[in-house]
C-alpha cells in the first residue's frame, strides 16, 4: 500500500487555508435583503450574518405586535438570503472542493 506524499498533503492543506481566507473576504462583501408585510419592513444583513439595517414604514408603528412580527420575518428572510448567497459564493471560490454547508458551520454561520 502506497503512503500518501507528505508534500502533496501539505500543499492541499495550504490551498484549503488560502481558500478559507478568500471565502472570509467574500462573505464580508456580501449583502442580502429581506422584507415582510409587502415591504413595510425591510432588513439588510451581511454575508457574515450581521444585521446592517432595518427600515420600518412609519405608518405601521401604531400596531406594536404587527411590527414585532414583521421585523422578525424580515430579518429571518434576509438571513436566509444571506446564507444562500454565502453557499453560492463558497461553491464558486472553492470550486466544489469544500461543502458550503459544513464550511459555514465551521465559520459559525448558518444552522
From Swiss-Prot:
Molecular function in Gene Ontology: DNA binding
Main subcellular location: cytoplasm
Keywords: Cytoplasm, DNA-binding
Subcellular location: Cytoplasm, Nucleoid
Keyword flag Lipid metabolism: no
GO cellular component, one term: bacterial nucleoid
UniProt record similarity statement: Belongs to the YbaB/EbfC family.
Complex formation: Homodimer.
Biological function: Binds to DNA and alters its conformation. May be involved in regulation of gene expression, nucleoid organization and DNA protection.
NCBIfam families the record matches: DNA_YbaB_EbfC
The protein, known as: Nucleoid-associated protein Cag_1190
Amino acid at each position: 500500500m502506497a503512503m500518501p506524499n507528505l508534500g502533496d498533503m501539505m500543499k492541499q492543506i495550504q490551498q484549503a487555508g488560502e481558500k478559507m481566507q478568500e471565502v472570509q473576504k467574500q462573505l464580508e462583501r456580501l449583502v442580502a435583503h429581506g422584507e415582510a408585510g409587502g415591504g413595510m419592513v425591510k432588513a439588510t444583513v451581511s454575508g457574515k450574518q450581521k444585521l446592517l439595517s432595518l427600515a420600518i414604514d412609519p405608518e405601521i408603528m401604531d400596531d406594536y405586535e404587527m411590527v414585532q412580527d414583521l421585523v422578525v420575518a424580515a430579518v429571518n428572510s434576509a438571513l436566509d438570503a444571506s446564507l444562500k448567497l454565502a453557499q453560492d459564493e463558497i461553491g464558486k471560490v472553492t470550486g466544489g472542493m469544500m461543502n458550503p454547508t459544513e464550511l459555514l458551520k465551521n465559520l459559525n454561520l448558518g444552522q
